[in-house]
């Protein structure tokens, strides 16, 4: 098993938390994990991305070469476009279709989505809307949408959420699990 995943978005969207959950689930299965993350501006709105490599064999480097990512998981559509050079020819993009407009010259969202829809494997939906319906965060909804492409049993993702968020209380754990379940059904 080998998965190279680029997670991207903007500061405050919970991309680092999603990477932590996937890493924890993979480690619980005895898989090897390498991760590299870059935090943009320390305030909400700066670009954030993480390279996450998972495999049954040892992993030498934590950075995914361009053209080799199996998945790009993005909390923001323009950020998904920014990291497309990393996507393999048969890779999947899973992205929130709702933009985070934090710059004056943000491109027309219809143009951004049209570019993403040209990809052979793209799941794009309004994760913010799904999250509101279950009173949760969109990052967890996106994790649920990506679950079918991770080659990690869904139960292991739920168990990782329980381990990671249990100190925040049962309500937070239940909210996050409800969100990944809603994301798995969304598309």
Task: Please name every model-derived segment.
Residues 1-187:
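Active-site cofactor/cluster-binding pocket
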């Amino acid at each position: 098993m080998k998965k190279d995943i680029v997670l991207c978005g903007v500061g405050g969207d919970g991309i680092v938390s999603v990477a932590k959950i996937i890493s924890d689930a993979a480690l619980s299965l005895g898989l090897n994990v390498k991760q590299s993350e870059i935090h943009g501006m320390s305030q909400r709105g700066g670009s954030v991305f993480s390279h996450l490599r998972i495999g049954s064999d040892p992993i030498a480097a934590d950075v995914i070469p361009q053209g080799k990512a199996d998945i790009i998981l993005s909390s923001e559509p323009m950020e998904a476009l920014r990291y497309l050079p990393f996507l393999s020819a048969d890779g999947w993009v899973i992205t929130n279709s709702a933009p985070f407009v934090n710059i004056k010259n943000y491109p027309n969202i219809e143009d951004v989505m049209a570019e993403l829809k040209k990809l052979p494997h793209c799941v794009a939906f309004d994760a913010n809307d799904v999250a509101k319906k279950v009173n949760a965060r969109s990052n967890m909804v996106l994790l649920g949408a990506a679950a079918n492409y991770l080659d990690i049993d869904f139960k292991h993702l739920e168990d990782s959420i329980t381990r990671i968020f249990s100190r925040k209380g049962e309500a937070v754990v239940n909210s996050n699990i409800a969100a990944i379940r809603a994301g798995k059904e969304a598309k």
